Amino acid sequence: MESLTLQPIARVDGTINLPGSKSVSNRALLLAALAHGKTVLTNLLDSDDVRHMLNALTGLGVSYTLSADRTRCEIIGNGGPLHAEGALELFLGNAGTAMRPLAAALCLGSNDIVLTGEPRMKERPIGHLVDALRLGGAKITYLEQENYPPLRLQGGFTGGNVDVDGSVSSQFLTALLMTAPLAPEDTVIRIKGDLVSKPYIDITLNLMKTFGVEIENQHYQQFVVKGGQSYQSPGTYLVEGDASSASYFLAAAAIKGGTVKVTGIGRNSMQGDIRFADVLEKMGATICWGDDYISCTRGELNAIDMDMNHIPDAAMTIATAALFAKGTTTLRNIYNWRVKETDRLFAMATELRKVGAEVEEGHDYIRITPPEKLNFAEIATYNDHRMAMCFSLVALSDTPVTILDPKCTAKTFPDYFEQLARISQAA
């Protein structure tokens, strides 16, 4: 297996122009495909997950042109639901941001489409979404294991009263929200359980509004969506920088700054993961907010005990930053780490122990006490981009770290290690 050894980093300083947000890129691509008119998306993320969405749109007959660097995309909207000519199979890799929204959107009208993906995708639950779509009339068949992809979709979603469990993934609700306006009837979506990752729902609502559709949000408990609507192209749309990707550089500055400035997001960003900067500030770093940037300057870091349900992806970065904080850090209410690219609670606990941390792994929490000195270790990444990026922070000690399968960052940030090297000074 390929590996990358990072030598100790003495200091980080500089500016990072963030790649586009994965969450925003894939939502914007789907809405642009469903909309009337031509949409030009700029600062689109070029990564595995986005390529899977683009490949699916090609399979569905959507025409678009990409710039040479794949960050500008011109899409000719379909002016309504997407249809396949005859039976079709779409392979979506391990891209939850493609699988979940497409599973819903392709239930409009009459299709015969199979959605499948990598082995890990077949372990990521989708039952709550399928249950909700079936309540709205959709005809969906599990082809292998009940409640997991691959799925066969045969249309039929017309709207009506739909319940969805919000406790596992907010992407199920996102998928329903984006699909419901195009259904013939009105849809009332009721949320069962506690809604996780609520800020991601705000991204969805924000984008839908950009494409001309507003819905009634009743305190995130119930959503009322008028049927028979259509999305309208906004003309051009700039994709925000990826706030989850920003977390690694901001944390690096908190540990070994200097000052690092990330551009492409700022105080008015729609992504909940910008709140990660508040967590670093609480730990002792200095944060400065602009309209189009966030900067972080080193501080003496202290441990925290926090509910991280609102920023689950960025919270992983706090788990490795905790290695540099004084005291024991506890991250709570993060059960949904277990259903991501890998079981992130298990993976994080296992790898933190390798570098010498004392770790308690609970059902939905992790408690981390750093060692006096970090051990040199080979870090397994579990084909999870965030594991690779989080553990790069270990090099901010006086100990090198080896990252196995470093190219797994291609899911969201193909040139992550080059960007980190650009702001790093060797010890």
Curated annotation (Swiss-Prot):
Phosphoenolpyruvate binds at residues 22, 96, 124, 171, 344, 386, 411. InterPro entries: Enolpyruvate_Tfrase_dom, Enolpyruvate_Tfrase_sf, EPSP_synthase, EPSP_synthase_CS, RNA3'P_cycl/enolpyr_Trfase_a/b. One of its GO terms (biological process) is chorismate biosynthetic process. Keywords: Amino-acid biosynthesis, Aromatic amino acid biosynthesis, Cytoplasm, Transferase. CDD domains: EPT-like. Its EC number is 2.5.1.19. The keyword Secreted does not apply. One of its GO terms (cellular component) is cytoplasm. Its main location: cytoplasm. It is an enzyme of class 2 (transferase). Catalyzes the transfer of the enolpyruvyl moiety of phosphoenolpyruvate (PEP) to the 5-hydroxyl of shikimate-3-phosphate (S3P) to produce enolpyruvyl shikimate-3-phosphate and inorganic phosphate. HAMAP family: EPSP_synth (MF_00210). This is 3-phosphoshikimate 1-carboxyvinyltransferase. It comes from Escherichia coli O9:H4 (strain HS). The lineage of its organism: Bacteria, Pseudomonadati, Pseudomonadota, Gammaproteobacteria, Enterobacterales.
